[in-house]
A protein has these predicted regions:
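N-terminal pilin/flagellin-like segments and related low-complexity appendage regions
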Residues: 1-198
Length: 198
């Protein structure tokens, strides 16, 4: 499909704003913008001073970061299409037809021009390592997008004792991409073009 760019095939409701959104290095948050396509997958590196290389991710306090580790951001649609009765107030959704897409939260009306749209849950998850507040041991944590507060921390650790998280990304260097990985690179060596192809 086409990249998700605001006003180029996808429209956002007035409710698709969040107070505490997690922005990437290009100041793009959870939702598509008109300044570039949505990154469905992005990884940032936290250096030895617990600073995000390239900027972004201010939603994670410096004291809640583990040095020399990566942060993973994933934006996606979930599972099977839903019925309107199945929507919940703590999530965002994407209504789609063959002609258009509309991002909204429960309680907002879908445009009448969208005949029989399919409804999908839209998610933005952020995974990172953080020191445990009681003993300082590193643990894997997860933040998720909500209509009420933006990027919220899920209570408790997903896994404990993970000292570092480093992601290597496979890059297809073929002139005409063939889907085969030609090399693996660290997150801070991925080019803007490679992120947009990912």
């Amino acid at each position: 499909g086409s990249p998700m760019t605001k006003d180029l095939g996808i429209t956002l409701s007035s409710g698709t704003t969040v107070a505490k959104d997690c922005l990437d290095d290009l100041d793009r948050g959870s939702f598509p913008t008109s300044t570039g396509s949505l990154r469905s997958f992005w990884v940032a590196h936290i250096d030895g001073n617990r600073t995000v290389i390239g900027g972004g991710l201010d939603c994670i306090d410096v004291g809640d970061r583990i040095a020399n580790s990566d942060v993973v951001s994933i934006k996606r649609l979930v599972g099977n299409s839903l019925e309107s009765k199945d929507l919940v107030t703590t999530r965002f959704y994407l209504a789609t037809t063959t002609q258009s897409a509309y991002l909204f939260k429960k309680g907002e009306a879908i445009p009448g021009t969208m005949i029989n749209p399919q409804l999908w849950e839209y998610q933005h998850f952020i995974y990172y390592l953080s020191p445990n507040s009681k003993n300082g041991n590193p643990e894997l944590r997860k933040r998720y997008l909500t209509p009420g507060g933006g990027s919220l921390l899920i209570g408790g650790a997903m896994a404990e004792g993970i000292e570092q998280m480093r992601i290597l990304l496979g890059v297809d260097d073929s002139l005409v991409p063939d889907g085969e990985i030609d090399r693996y690179v660290a997150t801070n060596n991925v080019t803007g073009q490679e992120w947009s192809e990912g």
